[in-house]
Amino acid sequence: MVKFADRMDLLKGSAIRELLALANKPDIISFAGGMPAPELFPVDKVKAAADAVLDESGRVALQYTSTEGWPRLREQIAERMERKNNIHTDAAHILMTSGSQQGLDYSSRVFVNPGDVIIIESPSYLGALNAFKACQPTFVEIPTDDDGMIMEDLEKVLATTPNVKMIYVIPDFQNPTGRTWPIERRKKFMEIINKYEVPVIEDNPYGELRYSGEYLPALKSMDTKGLVVYLGTFSKILAPGYRLGWVCADDAILQKYNYMAQAAALQASTIGMMEVSKFIDMFDLDEHVATIRECYGHRNQLMQDTMAAAFPKEVKYTHPQGGLFAWVVLPEYIDTKVMAAQALEKKVAYVPGEGFFPNGDVHNCIRLNYSNMPDEKIVKGITLLGDVIKANMR
């Protein structure tokens, strides 16, 4: 009999991926995946950029490049981070990855030994939890409120818990809740981090997708001790098919990520990096992101309005100012994993909330995505989901 490593017992198939297999059927209204709207992909511009790369530098594009990644693209990312996030950095402090998911995988492998503690928000991104589980950590969940992680609880844990090796957070439009940390909470967080000197993984795939309110500084922009590792991605602002993300960190930490990348992947895709770089040179990425924001902002508001009309008043849900997701909390006696089968009978798919808690011990929540469905399907799907919820209410 084949014997697998113990860590494989900790890794399960992604509930989201399994749902997407069902939700991809054309008759299903899917609020399950975190997928961008495909009609917004700039196919003609991407083709023009790809043609230019192959015409000008085809043999270079098809060859290996450095582990750090294509130099011109890293320069463009550094400039954008300065302009958008107030993060003062340069190309030397950026490592390209195959999506920010690879950056998450590297993070736990760089910092965590079996049994070490990873502090997370409760709930937290399911994909990060799955990536971290391969390193066999102990998760410590910090409660959240409408403004994100509760700092008093974080400090209590740091003061009393040994072997905390890293803290994982999404301060902007968090997955799954859509919540955003206000400026005072960010400042308090960095004050605590500087006191305890624990590495922080700041995952920011949605930061540019703000539909209302003011942009807030990244934690990395407040980092005076080199403790924050910033993860970015082109998946939400250009196209996930490129599988291009990046890590931004100070020298000592980034060197370890670089070693990990050399061992695990060698590099991100040369041709993909060159095409994205050429796209940024040839076209206005800010203009494209503005188009995305306009579309998703409208769909977010439409979902909010439809939930207000279709859901029972006992149901609570978040009111995101950006990102891709809303978080729905039902009465505790409703198991949303059981209810998901009922919703699928109505041709509606969502992600049950239990997967966003490492112990899977919260059963009454739902994550809804609003970026991928057109208006009429949002209205129809949320209305049908409201009927399913009502049928489960006491």
Feature-to-residue mapping (PLM):
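Short, conserved charged micro-motifs
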Residues: 334-339, 376-380
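N-terminal small-domain helix-loop-helix segment of the aminotransferase-like
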Residues: 7-99, 106, 281-282, 349, ...
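PLP-dependent enzyme catalytic core of the Aspartate aminotransferase-like
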Residues: 345, 360-394
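Conserved core of the PLP fold type I
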Residues: 60-197, 201, 207-225, 296, ...
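A non-catalytic, amphipathic alpha-helix used as a structural packing/dimerization or gating element
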Residues: 72, 256-259, 290-302, 380, ...
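Conserved core segment of the aminotransferase class I/II
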Residues: 224-294
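Conserved glycine-rich beta-strand-loop-beta hairpin in the small C-terminal domain of fold type I
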Residues: 277, 294-304, 316-329, 339
